[in-house]
Amino acid sequence: MKIDYLTLFPEMFDVLNHSIMKRAQEKGIVELNTVNFRDYSGNKHNQVDDYPYGGGQGMVLKPEPIFNAMNAIDKTSKTRVILMCPQGKPFTQQVAESLAQEEHLVFICGHYEGYDERIREHLVTDELSIGDYVLTGGELAAITMTDAIVRLIPESIKEESHLDDSFSTGLLEYPQYTRPADYNGMKVPDVLLSGNHKHIESWRHEMRLKRTFERRPDLLEHYPLTQSDKEYLEHLKRDK
């Protein structure tokens, strides 16, 4: 996969040169490139923003730098051009899984008040948001999405490492424990020490249901509950 970032602050993406992202690049699994669209301003002052027509607060990113920078990137008809925008579709694990199947992504990371609408209308295939809040720029959102996407590409990490992640199964992840089995009187559940894999899997599934019920009950509306699941959830409701 190739990922390009249109940004005014390329140095912010240095954080992707560590850990799993670094190894994925070294293995040739993903290629990350930053493009400073100020270099494509097309004017002697390298101006990339201007006052909004009709008045209003803040500055708006001009179309020329973004269009020029996009023209300088090698693209195909399948390239997904993603606008970082608080108005966008919520970025979820399912969206990450979809984008992980693509060959080329371009993230447009804005600053200032917003984008000239012609950028949105004529260049963008997707508008995505990481939450109902506003950041000073799109870089942090793009970095967050990149981490979520790249770890899903085969060979980035061990496949089984992400299969049980929260949201990958439709439920939140079960509690995890490691040694020691007893730390200052705080003990690991006996079932995890039993060696009975059937009982362990049953416990983990119940814990997924319990955590989802307690923290994200909205997810249960779309999860295919078995009769046993429904009975367990009714038990949780009675004990609440």
Curated annotation (Swiss-Prot):
GO terms for biological process: tRNA N1-guanine methylation. It catalyses: guanosine(37) in tRNA + S-adenosyl-L-methionine = N(1)-methylguanosine(37) in tRNA + S-adenosyl-L-homocysteine + H(+). Gene3D superfamilies: 3.40.1280.10, tRNA(m1g37)methyltransferase, domain 2 (1.10.1270.20). HAMAP family: TrmD. GO terms for molecular function: tRNA (guanine(37)-N1)-methyltransferase activity. Coiled coil: none annotated. S-adenosyl-L-methionine binds at residues 110, 130-135. The keyword Iron-sulfur does not apply. Its main location: cytoplasm. InterPro entries: Alpha/beta_knot_MTases, tRNA_m1G_MeTrfase_C_sf, tRNA_m1G_MeTrfase_TrmD, tRNA_m1G_MTases_N, tRNA_MeTrfase_TRMD/TRM10. Its EC number is 2.1.1.228. This is tRNA (guanine-N(1)-)-methyltransferase. Keywords: Cytoplasm, Methyltransferase, S-adenosyl-L-methionine, Transferase, tRNA processing. It is found in: Cytoplasm. GO terms for cellular component: cytosol. The keyword Nucleotide-binding does not apply. Homodimer. It comes from the Bacteria. Specifically methylates guanosine-37 in various tRNAs. Belongs to the RNA methyltransferase TrmD family. It holds the Pfam family tRNA_m1G_MT.
